[in-house]
Amino acid sequence: MVLCFPLLLLLLVLWGQVCPLHAIPKHLTRAQWFEIQHIRPSPLQCNRAMSHINNYTQHCKPQNTFLHDSFQNVAAVCDLLSITCKNGLHNCHQSLKPVNMTDCRLTSGKYPQCRYSAAAQYKLFIVACDPPQKGDPPYKLVPVHLDSIL
């Protein structure tokens, strides 16, 4: 039994080093974190925009897509027909029309000096949606994950 505790502690420490890569900052809801990561009404400079995200996670995120639309318009996609997400859940929704977006990809650097390339796109998207949490806008469903770009 005494041997199990140090092993469990080691596993928790190792898990904690991996988990923050996908963890949502504690003071944000999933929808708020989605908005920070993926909603920018106008085109942007990837190095600056990604710096804001990377400051939350303390690492260089390898890739990120920003939708150039409002949170309200993206949330409206949650009212469309549900489809199956990449993870097998049935809470995804596809946009009916393409939107402008910027795809940012890590090219070099280590946090906090992350460098990104930018690619402008005009495509459809699929978002996962969930009921709002306390602090979210009062929609029936809110976007919480950018599942796919088509």
From Swiss-Prot:
Q: Which SMART domains match?
A: RNAse_Pc
Checking CDD domains in the record gives: RNase_A_canonical
Compartment annotation: Secreted; Lysosome; Cytoplasmic granule
Q: Which PANTHER family does the record associate with it?
A: RIBONUCLEASE, RIBONUCLEASE K6
- Tell me where the signal peptide lies: 1-23
The keyword Signal appears for this protein: yes
Q: Where does substrate bind?
A: 61-65, 86, 105
Q: Which residues are glycosylated?
A: 55, 100
Q: Which cellular component appears as one GO term in the record?
A: extracellular space
One Pfam family from the record: RnaseA
**Tell me, what is one Gene Ontology molecular-function annotation carried by this entry?**
nucleic acid binding
- Reported EC number(s) for this entry are 3.1.27.-
Q: What is this protein called?
A: Ribonuclease K6
Job of this protein: Ribonuclease which shows a preference for the pyrimidines uridine and cytosine. Has potent antibacterial activity against a range of Gram-positive and Gram-negative bacteria, including P.aeruginosa, A.baumanii, M.luteus, S.aureus, E.faecalis, E.faecium, S.saprophyticus and E.coli. Causes loss of bacterial membrane integrity, and also promotes agglutination of Gram-negative bacteria. Probably contributes to urinary tract sterility. Bactericidal activity is independent of RNase activity.
Family statement drawn from the similarity comment of this UniProt entry:
Belongs to the pancreatic ribonuclease family.
The active site is formed by 38, 145
